[in-house]
Amino acid sequence: MYICYDRHFPEGARALGLNGAEMVFIPSATSRGLSEYLWRIEQPSHAVANGYFVGTINRVGIEPLGDDDFYGQSYFVDPRGQFIGDVGDAHQEELLVRDMDLSMIEQVRQTWQFYRDRRPDMYDDLVAP
């Protein structure tokens, strides 16, 4: 599970994969604005880089005590970064149900050897304060 704002940081997505994740859910309450553009590119990137499925969930509606307009558009992507079915509605609550072939995880990880080819010796600066 990766929650809302965390999705902007690839290090955590990688840690989930290295710890055996095959499916990562990312619940969010994200309103329109700059991050709407990122909504459809970050999670497929996490799926590809880590060879797992991603379920990206965002709420819809407007907060009564503010002007936040939440844009929904929940979706699932496979380990190749491809959308599974249609993206959810931008205005109506709905339940998305998707079939996933879990054997795709191993196929993708064996084809794209991103874990094998990574260079942790180069990452010291990523974890320095």
Regions found by a protein language model. Give the residues of each.
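Cysteine/selenocysteine-centered motifs that mediate thiol-based redox chemistry or coordinate metal-sulfur cofactors
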Residues: 14-18, 104-129
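A general marker of short, structured functional hotspots
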Residues: 1, 35, 67, 110-111, ...
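A short, polar/charged loop-to-alpha-helix boundary motif
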Residues: 92-110
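CN hydrolase (nitrilase-like) catalytic-core segments centered on the catalytic cysteine
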Residues: 4-94
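Conserved residues at beta->alpha junctions
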Residues: 3-4, 99
